[in-house]
């Protein structure tokens, strides 16, 4: 008899969880409180339903080849970065192709998820739901929580002196959908993440003036890398290796040099404050808006008056009509009881960011409570692949006593300042994917691949680390993975080839010969080094802190 699994939420992580359950012959039932799937990707003109959804102008920050389900590539005619409508179309195609919609109960709210009295033996859960006023109770062998990390807006008004005196409109970015209501107004956007940058840019087209306040500053990345390819496509295993062995000071220096060569961040009021951790956003239009005066950069807010804002640098902006806080979200699991509710909000103590450490049976998985320097969709899919195999007993995790001891020790060390709280840090995409797929048995062996299939191995190691790599071997192997990898550049270029242009001949340079003849020798040398456990121990001991590998191409000096 198939084990029954409750999946809470039908967004990107909920859809992948349903599919992963079916792949492992589990019986999923998905509960979705709205009338449609897609979660925040299902656009709505208003925020009356209290749901966090995309705003109208949103465009994806991760290109299509790096942000698809691992056995379901985007169609080749899809743009590399797409509107929310296009992305939702992809989710619909995925759900229909694998027959996922029949497992979703729409307009159903999960009220409570509690352990059954015999949980220590069975690992089962009581799940109480409500559909249009009617309550239901059911028993499940496992639960996958796929509600994401954008449920409850974080609006720390108490941190802003004088905010109670301000007479203008105050809202959180969760309430923002379309700019029409803000025409001709003077607007302050507080917070410079991806959302803050996007909203400031969109409002600058119709507002009288937009002010963008940031405490720390940020590095601003473009969606295209040198040469015009999607910047995510430089996220390779080769660069991942380099970032592990190069000195951090060199990486920091070259990174700052490269970023400021593209855009002098200090001149634009964007540079990172001294002592602050580097932060990145993706925004192609923000520098232009600043250059044209449509967006004015400001320091952090010091005080509010009835209609003005005073900033830390002593400047004042008067006649402010609207303040939009883009201050993030708080994690929330209202259907759990304590202490499980609190434990699940602490990402750093979840085992591999998935399993709570205090359960005798590993039958509860938190899917999607992660921050990555890559696609969250891909990360949630591999979390779900691993979790469903744990449910079936095909993969194991350490006993709860050991996990709780490690979690307690970690929290104590953080409180004492011995180690840093990294719960808000973005995980390295390739490292985390490798870690999860190593547990599954789906991580490709690069040396073995070079022996069996050199052409494929070359693309896997030096090309973009696309999700298809984790379908080449092991459980969940997909016959189309090899072809998907070898044709990923074709799908990248296809939507750009809308005008036939005659090719101009390119002279063969010395660099081409060096690449052709020197690269194989270099690769063999690196693989030998890579396999040296002593070398890896030395590297890991000496170089504890690294930037995300896919940034490295931006750090490296280039000849003009």
UniProtKB/Swiss-Prot annotation:
One of its GO terms (molecular function) is NADP binding. Its cofactor is FAD. The chain crosses the membrane at residues 510-530. NADP(+) binds at residues 60-61, 195-198. It catalyses: N,N-dimethylaniline + NADPH + O2 + H(+) = N,N-dimethylaniline N-oxide + NADP(+) + H2O. GO terms for cellular component: endoplasmic reticulum membrane. It comes from the Eukaryota. Keywords: Endoplasmic reticulum, FAD, Flavoprotein, Membrane, Microsome, Monooxygenase, NADP, Oxidoreductase, Transmembrane, Transmembrane helix. Its EC number is 1.14.13.8. The keyword Endoplasmic reticulum applies. InterPro entries: FAD/NAD-bd_sf (IPR036188), Flavin_mOase (IPR000960), Flavin_mOase-like (IPR020946), Flavin_mOase_4 (IPR002256), FMO-like (IPR050346). Belongs to the FMO family. This is Dimethylaniline monooxygenase [N-oxide-forming] 4. The lineage of its organism: Eukaryota, Metazoa, Chordata, Craniata, Vertebrata.
């Amino acid at each position: 008899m198939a084990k029954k699994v409750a999946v809470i939420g039908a967004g990107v992580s909920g859809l992948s969880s349903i599919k992963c359950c079916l792949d492992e012959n589990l019986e999923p039932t998905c509960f979705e409180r709205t009338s449609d799937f897609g979660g925040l990707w299902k656009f709505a003109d208003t925020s009356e339903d209290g749901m966090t959804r995309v705003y109208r102008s949103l465009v994806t920050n991760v290109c299509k080849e790096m942000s698809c389900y691992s056995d379901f590539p985007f169609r080749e005619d899809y743009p590399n970065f797409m509107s929310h409508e296009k992305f939702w179309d992809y989710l619909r195609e995925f759900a229909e192709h694998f027959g996922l919609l029949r497992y979703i109960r729409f307009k159903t709210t999960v009220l409570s998820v509690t352990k059954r009295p015999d949980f220590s033996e069975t690992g089962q859960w009581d799940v109480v739901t409500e559909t249009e006023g009617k309550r239901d109770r059911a028993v499940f062998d496992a639960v996958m929580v796929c509600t994401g990390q954008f449920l409850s807006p974080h609006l720390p008004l108490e941190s802003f002196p004088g905010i109670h005196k301000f007479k203008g409109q105050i809202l959180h970015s969760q309430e923002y959908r379309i700019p029409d209501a803000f025409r001709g107004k003077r607007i302050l956007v507080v917070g410079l993440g991806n959302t803050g940058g996007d909203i400031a840019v969109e409002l600058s087209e119709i507002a009288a003036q937009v002010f963008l306040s940031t405490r720390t500053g940020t590095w601003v990345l473009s969606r295209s890398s040198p040469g015009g390819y999607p910047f995510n496509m430089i996220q390779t295993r080769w660069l991942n290796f380099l970032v592990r062995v190069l000195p951090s000071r060199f990486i920091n220096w070259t990174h700052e040099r490269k970023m400021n060569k593209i855009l002098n961040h200090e001149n634009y009021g964007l540079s990172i404050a001294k002592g602050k951790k580097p932060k990145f956003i993706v925004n192609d239009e923000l520098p232009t808006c600043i250059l044209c005066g449509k967006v004015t950069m400001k320091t952090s807010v010091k005080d509010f008056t009835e209609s003005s804002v005073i900033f830390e640098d002593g400047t004042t902006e008067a006649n402010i009509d609207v303040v939009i806080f883009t201050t993030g979200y708080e994690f929330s699991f209202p259907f759990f009881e304590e202490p499980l509710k609190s434990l699940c909000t602490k990402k750093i103590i979840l085992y591999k960011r998935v399993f709570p450490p205090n359960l005798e049976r590993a039958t509860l998985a938190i899917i999607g409570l992660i921050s990555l320097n890559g696609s969250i969709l891909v990360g949630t899919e591999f979390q779900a692949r691993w979790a469903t195999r744990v449910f079936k007993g095909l993969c194991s995790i350490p006993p709860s006593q050991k996990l709780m001891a490690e979690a307690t020790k970690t929290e104590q060390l953080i409180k004492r300042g011995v180690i840093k709280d990294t719960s808000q840090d973005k995980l390295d995409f390739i490292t985390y994917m490798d870690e999860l797929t190593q547990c599954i048995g789906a991580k490709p062996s690069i040396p073995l691949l070079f022996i069996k299939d050199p052409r494929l191995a070359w693309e896997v190691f030096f090309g973009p680390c696309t999700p298809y790599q984790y379908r080449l071997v092991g459980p969940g192997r997909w016959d189309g993975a090899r072809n998907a990898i070898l044709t990923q550049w074709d799908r990248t270029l296809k939507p750009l080839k809308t005008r036939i242009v005659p090719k101009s001949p390119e002279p063969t340079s010395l660099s081409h010969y060096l690449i052709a003849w020197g690269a194989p020798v270099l690769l063999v040398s690196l693989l030998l080094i890579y396999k040296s456990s002593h070398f890896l121990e030395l590297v890991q001991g000496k170089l504890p802190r690294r930037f995300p590998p896919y940034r490295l191409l931006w750090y490296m000096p280039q000849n003009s």
